Regions:
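N-terminal structural segment of carbohydrate-active enzymes
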Residues: 1-103, 118
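Aromatic- and acidic-residue-enriched segments that line the glycan-binding/catalytic groove
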Residues: 14-19, 64-80, 110-155, 240-252
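Active-site-adjacent "subsite" loops/lids of carbohydrate-active enzymes
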Residues: 120-192, 202
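Residue-level preference for long, well-ordered alpha-helices that form the structural scaffold
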Residues: 28, 35, 82, 86, ...
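Active-site-proximal helices and loops of the catalytic beta/alpha 8
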Residues: 94-98, 112, 117-121, 184-186, ...
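A cross-domain feature marking catalytic cores of carbohydrate-active enzymes
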Residues: 2-4, 58, 106-112, 201, ...
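Alpha-helical packing segments of well-folded alpha/beta enzyme cores
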Residues: 35, 39-42, 89, 93, ...
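Conserved, mostly hydrophobic/aromatic
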Residues: 46, 56, 77, 97, ...
Length: 253
């Protein structure tokens, strides 16, 4: 988690953002000042641990009123959060990591964005989000996909409900949303040479779109590394999402 690791550039601790925030290491919900420079300055330490790949929690802009340190409520899909550094800083970190024979995994979130994303103030289309008119909370029933007895209501609530009130649920069935997200992944791979993608909240998103996303990325980069977060309570639940699984009826994600 970059914000919690090391503060290599104090000049970006308190910079102007759209929303207010504070740096307070005594508060678990505030930002603590860690950044990309701090990671770069400690690559010796990371390498000495025997690390071969670094998975960073999301580094893209998370301009939210509270709890922005974790990065899981994106407000700009093409900009590194300036409190972590710049896009160029991210590229340099990856290059420096590669020089040591290590790799970098980028954390992406396509199920939802942050409620302070400009889309929420100027929505591209009404179906850009799910349940925009009436808030629906997801039931987090991640087994709904493969439960033969699940109700349509429970399955729809799982897929289309908002993760939390500050994380609007993106409608990946909208072809423009799907294209935006797919192109965003390819852009980042091309731009910074990141070695792999960790896709957050994988079972919460539309399975057809995510399958297409995987296909498009792998068509461009056949040897690429992708892992989806499928935080299940049972082994069979995790097995459903594995590549080549016989449990998911050909929906090879």
């Amino acid at each position: 988690m970059p914000d919690r690791f090391a503060n290599g550039d104090p000049s970006n601790d308190q910079i102007p953002m759209r929303t207010s925030y504070k740096v307070d290491r005594n508060s678990p919900n505030a930002r603590h000042g860690g950044d990309l420079a701090g990671i770069e300055q400690h690559l010796d330490y990371i390498e000495d641990l025997g690390v071969t790949a670094i998975w960073l929690n999301p580094v893209l802009e998370n301009d939210m009123e509270g709890g922005s340190y974790h990065g899981y409520a994106t407000t700009d899909y093409y900009r590194v959060d300036p409190r972590f550094g710049t896009n160029e800083d991210y590229v340099r970190l990856i290059e420096k990591t590669h020089e040591r024979g290590m790799r970098v995994v980028m954390d992406m979130i396509f199920n939802h964005c942050g409620s302070d994303h400009p889309w929420m103030k100027d929505i591209p289309s009404h179906d850009w989000f799910n349940n925009l008119d009436n808030y629906v909370q997801t039931n987090h029933d991640k087994e709904a996909y493969f439960d033969p007895y699940v109700s349509d209501y429970d399955k729809e609530t799982m897929l289309n409900g908002w993760f939390v009130p500050s994380m609007p649920d993106l409608n990946q069935k909208n072809p423009h949303v799907a294209k935006y997200l797919i192109q965003n992944s390819i852009w980042w791979i091309e731009y910074c040479g990141v070695d792999g993608i960790r896709q957050d909240t994988y079972p919460y998103a539309d399975v057809d779109m995510m399958r297409n996303w995987c296909t498009e990325v792998m068509n461009e980069y056949p040897e690429y590394n992708i892992v989806g977060e499928a935080w299940m309570n049972y082994t069979i639940g995790s097995a459903y999402w594995q590549k080549g699984s016989r449990l998911n009826f050909g929906q090879d994600t």
